[in-house]
Protein backbone atom coordinates (compact mmCIF):
# COMPACT_ATOMS: atom_id res chain seq x y z
CA UNK A 1 0.00 0.00 0.00
CA UNK A 2 1.32 3.49 -0.93
CA UNK A 3 1.47 6.54 1.31
CA UNK A 4 -1.26 9.02 0.35
CA UNK A 5 1.24 11.83 0.98
CA UNK A 6 3.71 10.38 -1.50
CA UNK A 7 0.96 9.75 -4.03
CA UNK A 8 0.05 13.43 -3.83
CA UNK A 9 3.68 14.51 -4.12
CA UNK A 10 4.23 12.30 -7.15
CA UNK A 11 1.60 14.32 -9.01
CA UNK A 12 3.32 17.64 -8.35
CA UNK A 13 4.62 19.47 -11.45
CA UNK A 14 8.24 19.35 -10.27
CA UNK A 15 8.19 15.56 -10.53
CA UNK A 16 7.59 15.84 -14.26
CA UNK A 17 11.03 17.48 -14.58
CA UNK A 18 14.12 15.53 -15.58
CA UNK A 19 16.95 15.02 -13.12
CA UNK A 20 20.18 13.05 -13.43
CA UNK A 21 22.97 12.11 -11.04
CA UNK A 22 26.41 13.49 -11.80
CA UNK A 23 28.27 11.68 -14.60
CA UNK A 24 31.69 13.24 -14.45
CA UNK A 25 33.24 11.45 -17.42
CA UNK A 26 30.62 12.88 -19.80
CA UNK A 27 30.50 16.35 -18.25
CA UNK A 28 27.23 15.96 -16.35
CA UNK A 29 28.58 18.03 -13.47
CA UNK A 30 27.76 21.70 -12.99
CA UNK A 31 30.81 22.87 -11.04
CA UNK A 32 34.03 21.61 -9.48
CA UNK A 33 34.71 18.56 -11.62
CA UNK A 34 37.79 16.63 -10.48
CA UNK A 35 38.83 16.86 -14.14
CA UNK A 36 38.83 20.66 -14.17
CA UNK A 37 42.38 22.02 -14.48
CA UNK A 38 44.18 23.73 -11.63
CA UNK A 39 44.74 27.45 -12.22
CA UNK A 40 48.16 28.34 -13.57
CA UNK A 41 49.93 30.73 -15.90
CA UNK A 42 53.52 31.19 -17.06
CA UNK A 43 54.59 34.16 -19.13
CA UNK A 44 57.94 34.39 -20.94
CA UNK A 45 58.83 37.64 -22.74
CA UNK A 46 55.18 38.65 -22.86
CA UNK A 47 54.00 35.32 -24.26
CA UNK A 48 51.89 32.81 -22.34
CA UNK A 49 53.77 29.52 -22.24
CA UNK A 50 51.45 27.75 -19.80
CA UNK A 51 47.72 28.18 -19.20
CA UNK A 52 45.75 26.26 -16.58
CA UNK A 53 48.09 23.29 -16.50
CA UNK A 54 48.75 23.09 -20.24
CA UNK A 55 52.03 23.98 -21.89
CA UNK A 56 51.88 25.98 -25.11
CA UNK A 57 52.60 22.85 -27.12
CA UNK A 58 49.38 21.33 -25.73
CA UNK A 59 47.14 24.34 -26.43
CA UNK A 60 44.02 23.81 -28.51
CA UNK A 61 42.48 26.60 -30.61
CA UNK A 62 40.63 28.03 -27.62
CA UNK A 63 43.71 28.09 -25.40
CA UNK A 64 45.70 29.87 -28.12
CA UNK A 65 42.99 32.48 -28.60
CA UNK A 66 42.54 33.18 -24.89
CA UNK A 67 46.29 33.25 -24.21
CA UNK A 68 46.92 35.74 -27.02
CA UNK A 69 43.97 38.08 -26.59
CA UNK A 70 41.83 37.28 -23.56
CA UNK A 71 43.87 37.94 -20.41
CA UNK A 72 45.40 41.10 -18.96
CA UNK A 73 48.94 39.76 -18.80
CA UNK A 74 50.33 42.83 -17.01
CA UNK A 75 48.80 41.67 -13.72
CA UNK A 76 48.19 37.99 -14.43
CA UNK A 77 51.02 36.51 -12.35
CA UNK A 78 50.21 38.81 -9.42
CA UNK A 79 46.51 37.89 -9.44
CA UNK A 80 47.11 34.18 -9.98
CA UNK A 81 49.21 34.18 -6.80
CA UNK A 82 46.38 35.69 -4.74
CA UNK A 83 44.20 33.53 -2.52
CA UNK A 84 40.95 32.62 -4.29
CA UNK A 85 38.89 32.92 -1.10
CA UNK A 86 40.19 36.45 -0.62
CA UNK A 87 39.26 37.29 -4.21
CA UNK A 88 35.79 35.82 -3.69
CA UNK A 89 35.37 38.04 -0.62
CA UNK A 90 36.45 41.07 -2.62
CA UNK A 91 33.88 40.26 -5.30
CA UNK A 92 30.92 40.26 -2.94
CA UNK A 93 32.18 42.98 -0.57
CA UNK A 94 30.38 46.25 -1.42
CA UNK A 95 33.29 48.17 0.13
CA UNK A 96 35.57 46.99 -2.69
CA UNK A 97 34.63 49.00 -5.74
CA UNK A 98 33.93 47.51 -9.14
CA UNK A 99 36.64 49.63 -10.76
CA UNK A 100 39.18 48.04 -8.42
CA UNK A 101 37.94 44.49 -9.04
CA UNK A 102 37.83 44.48 -12.86
CA UNK A 103 41.62 44.82 -13.27
CA UNK A 104 41.94 41.67 -11.14
CA UNK A 105 39.21 39.53 -12.70
CA UNK A 106 40.38 40.34 -16.22
CA UNK A 107 43.87 39.15 -15.27
CA UNK A 108 42.66 35.71 -14.15
CA UNK A 109 42.69 32.54 -16.21
CA UNK A 110 39.44 30.63 -16.81
CA UNK A 111 40.31 28.04 -14.16
CA UNK A 112 41.18 30.75 -11.64
CA UNK A 113 37.94 32.69 -11.97
CA UNK A 114 35.96 29.43 -11.75
CA UNK A 115 37.83 28.57 -8.56
CA UNK A 116 37.01 32.01 -7.15
CA UNK A 117 33.25 31.88 -7.78
CA UNK A 118 33.08 28.27 -6.60
CA UNK A 119 33.73 29.56 -3.08
CA UNK A 120 30.51 31.61 -3.21
CA UNK A 121 26.91 30.67 -2.45
CA UNK A 122 24.06 32.13 -4.50
CA UNK A 123 23.42 35.02 -2.10
CA UNK A 124 27.08 36.03 -2.28
CA UNK A 125 26.97 35.74 -6.06
CA UNK A 126 23.91 37.99 -6.18
CA UNK A 127 25.69 40.52 -3.96
CA UNK A 128 28.59 40.43 -6.39
CA UNK A 129 26.34 40.70 -9.44
CA UNK A 130 24.65 43.81 -8.04
CA UNK A 131 28.07 45.46 -8.05
CA UNK A 132 29.65 43.90 -11.12
CA UNK A 133 27.03 44.40 -13.84
CA UNK A 134 28.30 46.86 -16.40
CA UNK A 135 25.35 49.25 -16.68
CA UNK A 136 23.97 50.93 -13.58
CA UNK A 137 20.36 50.62 -14.76
CA UNK A 138 18.98 47.06 -15.14
CA UNK A 139 16.91 46.21 -18.20
CA UNK A 140 14.83 43.54 -19.94
CA UNK A 141 14.69 41.86 -23.34
CA UNK A 142 11.71 40.13 -24.98
CA UNK A 143 11.00 37.38 -27.48
CA UNK A 144 8.33 38.36 -30.03
CA UNK A 145 7.43 35.44 -32.31
CA UNK A 146 4.49 33.33 -33.45
CA UNK A 147 4.01 29.91 -34.98
CA UNK A 148 2.55 31.34 -38.21
CA UNK A 149 5.22 34.04 -38.70
CA UNK A 150 2.32 36.48 -38.96
CA UNK A 151 3.94 39.91 -39.39
CA UNK A 152 0.83 41.83 -38.30
CA UNK A 153 0.76 39.98 -35.00
CA UNK A 154 4.52 40.49 -34.57
CA UNK A 155 4.12 44.25 -35.06
CA UNK A 156 1.28 44.46 -32.52
CA UNK A 157 3.06 42.26 -29.96
CA UNK A 158 6.28 44.24 -30.43
CA UNK A 159 4.44 47.51 -29.81
CA UNK A 160 2.90 46.12 -26.63
CA UNK A 161 6.25 44.74 -25.48
CA UNK A 162 7.97 48.08 -26.02
CA UNK A 163 5.11 49.86 -24.23
CA UNK A 164 5.50 47.50 -21.27
CA UNK A 165 9.19 48.37 -20.94
CA UNK A 166 11.38 45.98 -22.93
CA UNK A 167 14.48 47.81 -24.22
CA UNK A 168 15.44 45.04 -26.66
CA UNK A 169 13.16 42.70 -28.61
CA UNK A 170 14.13 39.58 -30.53
CA UNK A 171 12.30 37.53 -33.10
CA UNK A 172 13.02 34.39 -35.09
CA UNK A 173 11.15 32.32 -37.64
CA UNK A 174 9.13 29.16 -38.03
CA UNK A 175 9.85 29.28 -41.78
CA UNK A 176 13.32 30.65 -42.58
CA UNK A 177 12.31 32.56 -45.70
CA UNK A 178 9.80 34.64 -43.71
CA UNK A 179 12.68 36.37 -41.92
CA UNK A 180 12.62 39.78 -43.68
CA UNK A 181 8.93 40.30 -42.88
CA UNK A 182 9.45 39.31 -39.25
CA UNK A 183 12.40 41.68 -38.90
CA UNK A 184 10.56 44.62 -40.46
CA UNK A 185 7.40 43.97 -38.43
CA UNK A 186 9.39 43.77 -35.20
CA UNK A 187 11.25 47.01 -35.83
CA UNK A 188 8.15 48.95 -36.90
CA UNK A 189 6.07 47.68 -33.98
CA UNK A 190 8.83 48.36 -31.47
CA UNK A 191 9.23 51.98 -32.57
CA UNK A 192 5.47 52.49 -32.30
CA UNK A 193 5.56 51.16 -28.73
CA UNK A 194 8.59 53.17 -27.64
CA UNK A 195 11.07 54.90 -29.94
CA UNK A 196 14.60 53.59 -29.45
CA UNK A 197 13.87 49.96 -28.66
CA UNK A 198 16.55 47.79 -30.29
CA UNK A 199 15.53 44.74 -32.32
CA UNK A 200 17.07 41.63 -33.82
CA UNK A 201 16.03 38.63 -35.91
CA UNK A 202 17.80 35.41 -34.94
CA UNK A 203 18.73 33.36 -38.03
CA UNK A 204 21.61 31.58 -39.68
CA UNK A 205 24.51 33.99 -39.66
CA UNK A 206 24.72 35.11 -43.31
CA UNK A 207 21.04 36.07 -43.51
CA UNK A 208 21.10 37.72 -40.11
CA UNK A 209 24.07 39.88 -41.11
CA UNK A 210 22.43 40.73 -44.44
CA UNK A 211 19.23 41.92 -42.71
CA UNK A 212 21.31 44.07 -40.40
CA UNK A 213 23.21 45.61 -43.28
CA UNK A 214 19.91 46.40 -45.02
CA UNK A 215 18.77 48.26 -41.91
CA UNK A 216 16.00 45.91 -40.82
CA UNK A 217 17.60 45.01 -37.45
CA UNK A 218 19.59 46.91 -34.81
CA UNK A 219 21.70 44.26 -33.11
CA UNK A 220 22.71 40.62 -33.18
CA UNK A 221 23.01 38.14 -30.36
CA UNK A 222 22.93 34.52 -31.49
CA UNK A 223 26.57 34.25 -32.58
CA UNK A 224 27.45 31.13 -30.63
CA UNK A 225 30.79 30.21 -29.07
CA UNK A 226 31.73 26.97 -27.33
CA UNK A 227 34.10 25.72 -24.67
CA UNK A 228 35.75 22.78 -26.43
CA UNK A 229 37.45 22.67 -29.80
CA UNK A 230 35.45 19.73 -31.24
CA UNK A 231 32.16 21.62 -30.79
CA UNK A 232 33.60 24.61 -32.63
CA UNK A 233 34.98 22.58 -35.51
CA UNK A 234 31.80 20.48 -35.71
CA UNK A 235 30.13 23.71 -36.80
CA UNK A 236 32.97 24.66 -39.18
CA UNK A 237 33.95 27.50 -36.87
CA UNK A 238 36.88 28.78 -34.84
CA UNK A 239 37.23 31.63 -32.35
CA UNK A 240 38.83 33.64 -35.17
CA UNK A 241 35.88 33.18 -37.54
CA UNK A 242 33.49 34.29 -34.82
CA UNK A 243 35.66 37.33 -34.15
CA UNK A 244 35.58 38.20 -37.85
CA UNK A 245 31.80 37.96 -37.86
CA UNK A 246 31.63 40.20 -34.80
CA UNK A 247 33.69 42.86 -36.54
CA UNK A 248 31.40 42.62 -39.58
CA UNK A 249 28.44 43.63 -37.44
CA UNK A 250 30.25 46.35 -35.54
CA UNK A 251 31.70 47.90 -38.71
CA UNK A 252 28.13 48.36 -39.97
CA UNK A 253 27.08 50.11 -36.78
CA UNK A 254 25.20 47.13 -35.40
CA UNK A 255 25.45 46.29 -31.73
CA UNK A 256 26.29 42.65 -31.18
CA UNK A 257 27.02 40.14 -28.48
CA UNK A 258 28.04 36.51 -28.51
CA UNK A 259 25.92 33.70 -27.05
CA UNK A 260 27.10 30.74 -25.01
CA UNK A 261 25.80 28.74 -22.08
CA UNK A 262 26.61 25.89 -19.75
CA UNK A 263 25.59 22.48 -21.02
CA UNK A 264 26.13 23.09 -24.74
CA UNK A 265 29.25 20.94 -24.87
CA UNK A 266 27.44 18.14 -23.02
CA UNK A 267 24.61 18.29 -25.54
CA UNK A 268 27.09 18.07 -28.40
CA UNK A 269 28.91 15.15 -26.77
CA UNK A 270 32.27 16.91 -26.40
CA UNK A 271 32.50 17.98 -22.76
CA UNK A 272 35.87 16.25 -22.25
CA UNK A 273 34.91 15.42 -18.67
CA UNK A 274 35.14 19.04 -17.55
CA UNK A 275 32.49 20.86 -15.51
CA UNK A 276 29.89 22.91 -17.32
CA UNK A 277 31.02 26.08 -15.55
CA UNK A 278 34.68 25.66 -16.50
CA UNK A 279 33.79 25.16 -20.17
CA UNK A 280 31.48 28.15 -20.04
CA UNK A 281 34.27 30.26 -18.52
CA UNK A 282 36.31 29.48 -21.63
CA UNK A 283 33.42 30.78 -23.75
CA UNK A 284 33.35 34.01 -21.76
CA UNK A 285 37.08 34.47 -22.25
CA UNK A 286 36.68 33.85 -25.99
CA UNK A 287 34.13 36.68 -26.02
CA UNK A 288 36.50 38.99 -24.18
CA UNK A 289 39.37 38.01 -26.45
CA UNK A 290 37.33 38.71 -29.59
CA UNK A 291 36.72 42.29 -28.48
CA UNK A 292 32.96 41.77 -28.32
CA UNK A 293 31.11 44.10 -25.93
CA UNK A 294 28.84 41.50 -24.36
CA UNK A 295 27.51 37.99 -24.05
CA UNK A 296 24.18 36.24 -23.70
CA UNK A 297 24.80 33.42 -21.27
CA UNK A 298 23.10 31.54 -18.47
CA UNK A 299 22.75 28.20 -20.26
CA UNK A 300 20.06 29.73 -22.53
CA UNK A 301 18.68 26.95 -24.77
CA UNK A 302 20.71 24.27 -22.94
CA UNK A 303 19.11 24.94 -19.54
CA UNK A 304 17.66 21.44 -19.31
CA UNK A 305 21.20 20.09 -18.88
CA UNK A 306 22.57 22.09 -15.90
CA UNK A 307 19.13 22.21 -14.28
CA UNK A 308 19.10 18.41 -14.17
CA UNK A 309 22.27 18.10 -12.06
CA UNK A 310 23.08 19.28 -8.51
CA UNK A 311 24.02 22.97 -8.16
CA UNK A 312 23.05 23.58 -11.77
CA UNK A 313 21.02 26.74 -11.27
CA UNK A 314 23.79 28.05 -9.02
CA UNK A 315 26.25 27.41 -11.85
CA UNK A 316 24.04 29.41 -14.21
CA UNK A 317 24.24 32.41 -11.88
CA UNK A 318 27.99 31.86 -11.57
CA UNK A 319 28.46 32.08 -15.33
CA UNK A 320 26.47 35.33 -15.42
CA UNK A 321 28.72 36.69 -12.67
CA UNK A 322 31.90 35.68 -14.50
CA UNK A 323 30.61 37.47 -17.60
CA UNK A 324 29.99 40.70 -15.70
CA UNK A 325 33.28 40.35 -13.85
CA UNK A 326 35.13 40.38 -17.16
CA UNK A 327 33.55 43.80 -17.82
CA UNK A 328 31.15 42.48 -20.45
CA UNK A 329 27.47 43.22 -20.93
CA UNK A 330 25.50 40.25 -19.60
CA UNK A 331 22.19 39.24 -21.13
CA UNK A 332 21.50 36.70 -18.44
CA UNK A 333 19.09 34.25 -20.09
CA UNK A 334 15.99 33.33 -18.05
CA UNK A 335 15.20 32.21 -21.51
CA UNK A 336 14.18 28.72 -22.58
CA UNK A 337 11.68 26.97 -20.31
CA UNK A 338 13.11 24.11 -18.26
CA UNK A 339 10.61 23.11 -15.58
CA UNK A 340 6.95 22.33 -15.00
CA UNK A 341 7.18 23.90 -11.54
CA UNK A 342 6.15 27.54 -11.05
CA UNK A 343 8.12 27.61 -7.80
CA UNK A 344 11.26 26.36 -9.51
CA UNK A 345 11.09 28.73 -12.49
CA UNK A 346 10.53 31.67 -10.15
CA UNK A 347 13.55 30.70 -8.05
CA UNK A 348 15.61 30.52 -11.24
CA UNK A 349 14.42 34.02 -12.25
CA UNK A 350 15.14 35.59 -8.87
CA UNK A 351 18.88 34.88 -9.17
CA UNK A 352 19.10 37.65 -11.79
CA UNK A 353 15.94 39.62 -11.01
CA UNK A 354 16.98 40.53 -7.45
CA UNK A 355 20.51 41.86 -8.07
CA UNK A 356 19.66 43.12 -11.56
CA UNK A 357 21.63 42.39 -14.70
CA UNK A 358 22.09 44.27 -17.96
CA UNK A 359 19.21 42.22 -19.39
CA UNK A 360 17.51 40.11 -16.73
CA UNK A 361 15.91 37.91 -19.38
CA UNK A 362 17.10 37.34 -22.92
CA UNK A 363 14.38 36.92 -23.38
CA UNK A 364 11.08 37.08 -21.65
CA UNK A 365 8.37 35.80 -24.00
CA UNK A 366 6.13 38.78 -24.80
CA UNK A 367 3.72 36.29 -26.36
CA UNK A 368 2.06 33.17 -24.91
CA UNK A 369 4.54 30.32 -24.89
CA UNK A 370 2.60 28.36 -27.50
CA UNK A 371 3.72 31.10 -29.92
CA UNK A 372 7.33 31.22 -28.72
CA UNK A 373 9.55 29.91 -31.51
CA UNK A 374 12.57 29.83 -29.20
CA UNK A 375 11.02 26.71 -27.62
CA UNK A 376 9.21 28.62 -24.89
CA UNK A 377 10.52 30.94 -22.20
CA UNK A 378 10.85 30.83 -18.43
CA UNK A 379 8.34 33.73 -18.32
CA UNK A 380 5.68 34.58 -20.91
CA UNK A 381 2.89 37.08 -21.62
CA UNK A 382 0.61 35.38 -19.11
CA UNK A 383 3.12 36.24 -16.37
CA UNK A 384 3.09 40.02 -16.92
CA UNK A 385 0.89 40.76 -13.91
CA UNK A 386 2.83 38.38 -11.64
CA UNK A 387 6.09 40.00 -12.73
CA UNK A 388 4.80 43.50 -12.05
CA UNK A 389 3.61 42.43 -8.60
CA UNK A 390 7.05 40.92 -7.86
CA UNK A 391 8.62 44.27 -8.70
CA UNK A 392 6.11 46.00 -6.41
CA UNK A 393 6.40 43.47 -3.56
CA UNK A 394 10.19 43.57 -3.44
CA UNK A 395 10.79 47.14 -4.65
CA UNK A 396 12.95 45.80 -7.45
CA UNK A 397 13.24 47.31 -10.92
CA UNK A 398 12.85 44.36 -13.26
CA UNK A 399 12.57 46.55 -16.33
CA UNK A 400 8.81 46.35 -16.91
CA UNK A 401 5.83 48.45 -15.84
CA UNK A 402 2.08 48.09 -15.26
CA UNK A 403 -0.06 49.18 -18.22
CA UNK A 404 -3.71 49.96 -18.89
CA UNK A 405 -5.76 47.80 -21.23
CA UNK A 406 -7.03 50.74 -23.27
CA UNK A 407 -3.48 51.98 -23.85
CA UNK A 408 -2.30 48.56 -25.01
CA UNK A 409 -5.26 48.21 -27.39
CA UNK A 410 -4.47 51.62 -28.89
CA UNK A 411 -0.75 50.95 -29.30
CA UNK A 412 -1.34 47.51 -30.85
CA UNK A 413 -3.81 49.03 -33.31
CA UNK A 414 -1.40 51.77 -34.32
CA UNK A 415 1.40 49.25 -34.90
CA UNK A 416 -0.80 47.04 -37.07
CA UNK A 417 -1.95 50.03 -39.11
CA UNK A 418 1.63 51.29 -39.47
CA UNK A 419 2.73 47.93 -40.85
CA UNK A 420 -0.30 47.95 -43.14
CA UNK A 421 1.01 51.25 -44.54
CA UNK A 422 4.51 49.82 -44.95
CA UNK A 423 3.27 46.81 -46.88
CA UNK A 424 1.08 49.00 -49.08
CA UNK A 425 3.86 51.52 -49.72
CA UNK A 426 6.42 48.84 -50.59
CA UNK A 427 4.07 46.83 -52.80
CA UNK A 428 4.04 43.82 -50.47
CA UNK A 429 1.06 41.47 -50.00
CA UNK A 430 -1.73 43.59 -48.50
CA UNK A 431 -2.68 43.58 -44.83
CA UNK A 432 -6.45 43.64 -44.50
CA UNK A 433 -8.49 45.67 -42.04
CA UNK A 434 -9.67 42.33 -40.64
CA UNK A 435 -6.06 41.43 -39.78
CA UNK A 436 -5.49 44.83 -38.17
CA UNK A 437 -8.60 44.38 -36.03
CA UNK A 438 -7.60 40.85 -35.02
CA UNK A 439 -4.03 41.87 -34.12
CA UNK A 440 -5.36 44.77 -32.04
CA UNK A 441 -7.15 42.41 -29.65
CA UNK A 442 -5.21 39.14 -30.10
CA UNK A 443 -3.52 37.17 -27.35
CA UNK A 444 -1.79 34.82 -29.77
CA UNK A 445 -1.79 33.32 -33.25
CA UNK A 446 -4.94 31.32 -32.46
CA UNK A 447 -6.77 34.64 -32.63
CA UNK A 448 -5.40 35.67 -36.05
CA UNK A 449 -6.79 35.03 -39.56
CA UNK A 450 -4.63 33.11 -42.04
CA UNK A 451 -2.36 34.88 -44.51
CA UNK A 452 -1.27 33.70 -47.96
CA UNK A 453 2.02 32.17 -46.84
CA UNK A 454 3.26 31.36 -50.36
CA UNK A 455 2.75 34.96 -51.47
CA UNK A 456 4.32 36.33 -48.29
CA UNK A 457 7.44 34.19 -48.67
CA UNK A 458 7.84 35.18 -52.31
CA UNK A 459 7.83 38.88 -51.48
CA UNK A 460 9.87 38.41 -48.29
CA UNK A 461 12.67 36.92 -50.37
CA UNK A 462 12.54 39.92 -52.68
CA UNK A 463 13.55 42.08 -49.71
CA UNK A 464 16.82 40.14 -49.61
CA UNK A 465 17.31 39.57 -53.33
CA UNK A 466 16.62 43.18 -54.34
CA UNK A 467 18.40 44.76 -51.35
CA UNK A 468 15.31 46.66 -50.24
CA UNK A 469 16.51 48.60 -47.23
CA UNK A 470 15.26 50.35 -44.14
CA UNK A 471 14.92 53.71 -45.85
CA UNK A 472 12.17 52.23 -48.02
CA UNK A 473 10.32 51.36 -44.82
CA UNK A 474 10.79 54.93 -43.58
CA UNK A 475 9.47 56.32 -46.88
CA UNK A 476 6.42 54.03 -46.85
CA UNK A 477 5.57 55.08 -43.29
CA UNK A 478 5.83 58.76 -44.14
CA UNK A 479 3.72 58.39 -47.28
CA UNK A 480 1.18 56.34 -45.34
CA UNK A 481 0.61 59.11 -42.81
CA UNK A 482 2.79 57.74 -39.99
CA UNK A 483 5.34 60.55 -40.00
CA UNK A 484 6.14 60.16 -36.30
CA UNK A 485 6.98 56.47 -36.70
CA UNK A 486 8.92 57.25 -39.88
CA UNK A 487 11.07 59.73 -37.95
CA UNK A 488 11.66 57.23 -35.16
CA UNK A 489 12.67 54.57 -37.70
CA UNK A 490 15.04 57.05 -39.33
CA UNK A 491 16.56 57.88 -35.95
CA UNK A 492 17.34 54.20 -35.41
CA UNK A 493 19.22 54.15 -38.73
CA UNK A 494 21.09 57.31 -37.70
CA UNK A 495 22.13 55.63 -34.44
CA UNK A 496 24.10 53.11 -36.49
CA UNK A 497 26.10 55.97 -38.01
CA UNK A 498 26.93 57.70 -34.74
CA UNK A 499 27.90 54.39 -33.13
CA UNK A 500 27.17 55.40 -29.53
CA UNK A 501 25.08 52.29 -28.93
CA UNK A 502 28.06 50.07 -29.74
CA UNK A 503 29.44 50.84 -26.29
CA UNK A 504 29.26 48.12 -23.64
CA UNK A 505 25.73 47.38 -22.45
CA UNK A 506 24.07 50.13 -24.46
CA UNK A 507 20.34 50.76 -24.68
CA UNK A 508 18.51 53.73 -26.20
CA UNK A 509 16.09 55.47 -23.86
CA UNK A 510 14.04 58.69 -24.09
CA UNK A 511 14.81 61.18 -26.88
CA UNK A 512 17.44 58.93 -28.41
CA UNK A 513 19.70 59.06 -25.35
CA UNK A 514 22.11 56.14 -25.16
CA UNK A 515 22.65 54.61 -21.72
CA UNK A 516 25.71 52.39 -21.48
CA UNK A 517 28.54 51.36 -19.19
CA UNK A 518 30.30 54.54 -20.33
CA UNK A 519 27.74 57.13 -19.19
CA UNK A 520 25.66 55.01 -16.78
CA UNK A 521 28.48 53.53 -14.75
CA UNK A 522 27.50 51.02 -12.08
CA UNK A 523 28.65 52.74 -8.90
CA UNK A 524 27.13 50.35 -6.37
CA UNK A 525 29.08 50.45 -3.12
CA UNK A 526 26.57 49.23 -0.56
CA UNK A 527 23.33 50.66 0.89
CA UNK A 528 22.16 54.02 -0.49
CA UNK A 529 24.48 53.76 -3.51
CA UNK A 530 24.15 52.52 -7.07
CA UNK A 531 20.85 52.19 -8.89
CA UNK A 532 17.87 52.81 -6.61
CA UNK A 533 14.20 52.34 -7.48
CA UNK A 534 12.72 55.70 -6.53
CA UNK A 535 10.85 58.76 -7.74
CA UNK A 536 8.63 58.51 -10.82
CA UNK A 537 9.81 55.01 -11.64
CA UNK A 538 8.80 53.68 -8.21
CA UNK A 539 5.43 55.44 -8.46
CA UNK A 540 4.92 53.77 -11.84
CA UNK A 541 5.67 50.30 -10.47
CA UNK A 542 3.51 50.84 -7.37
CA UNK A 543 0.49 51.79 -9.48
CA UNK A 544 -0.75 48.36 -10.57
CA UNK A 545 -4.32 48.36 -11.98
CA UNK A 546 -5.62 45.98 -9.30
CA UNK A 547 -4.62 48.16 -6.33
CA UNK A 548 -7.60 49.68 -4.50
CA UNK A 549 -7.54 53.38 -3.65
CA UNK A 550 -8.79 53.87 -0.05
CA UNK A 551 -10.00 57.35 -1.02
CA UNK A 552 -12.42 55.81 -3.50
CA UNK A 553 -13.90 53.21 -1.14
CA UNK A 554 -17.05 53.64 0.85
UniProtKB/Swiss-Prot annotation:
Domain of life, source organism? Bacteria
- Name the reaction it catalyses: propane-1,2-diol = propanal + H2O
SUPFAM superfamilies, alphabetically? Answer: Cobalamin (vitamin B12)-dependent enzymes (SSF51703)
Q: Where in the cell is it found?
A: Bacterial microcompartment
The family database entries (Gene3D superfamilies) matched by this protein are listed as: Diol/glycerol dehydratase, large subunit
Which cofactors is this protein said to need? adenosylcob(III)alamin
What is this enzyme's class at the first EC digit? lyase
* Pathway listed: Polyol metabolism; 1,2-propanediol degradation
Q: Which NCBIfam families match?
A: PRK15444.1
Q: Which family does it belong to?
A: Belongs to the diol/glycerol dehydratase large subunit family.
What is its quaternary makeup?
The propanediol dehydratase enzyme is a heterotrimeric complex composed of a large (PduC), a medium (PduD) and a small (PduE) subunit.
Q: Provide the protein name.
A: Propanediol dehydratase large subunit
Amino acid sequence: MRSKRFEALAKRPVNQDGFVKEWIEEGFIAMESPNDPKPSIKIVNGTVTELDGKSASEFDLIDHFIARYGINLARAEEVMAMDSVKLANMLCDPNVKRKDIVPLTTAMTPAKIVEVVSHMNVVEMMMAMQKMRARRTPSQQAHVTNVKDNPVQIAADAAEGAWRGFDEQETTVAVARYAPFNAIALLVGSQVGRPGVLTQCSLEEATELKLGMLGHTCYAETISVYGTEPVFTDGDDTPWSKGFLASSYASRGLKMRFTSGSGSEVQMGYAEGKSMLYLEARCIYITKAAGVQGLQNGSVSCIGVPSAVPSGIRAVLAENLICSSLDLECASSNDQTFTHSDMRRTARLLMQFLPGTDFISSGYSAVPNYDNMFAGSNEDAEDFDDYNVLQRDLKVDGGLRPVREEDVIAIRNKAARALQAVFAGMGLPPITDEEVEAATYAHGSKDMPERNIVEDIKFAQEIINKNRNGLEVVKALAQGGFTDVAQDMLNIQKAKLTGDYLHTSAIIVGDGQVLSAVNDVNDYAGPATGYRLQGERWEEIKNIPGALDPNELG
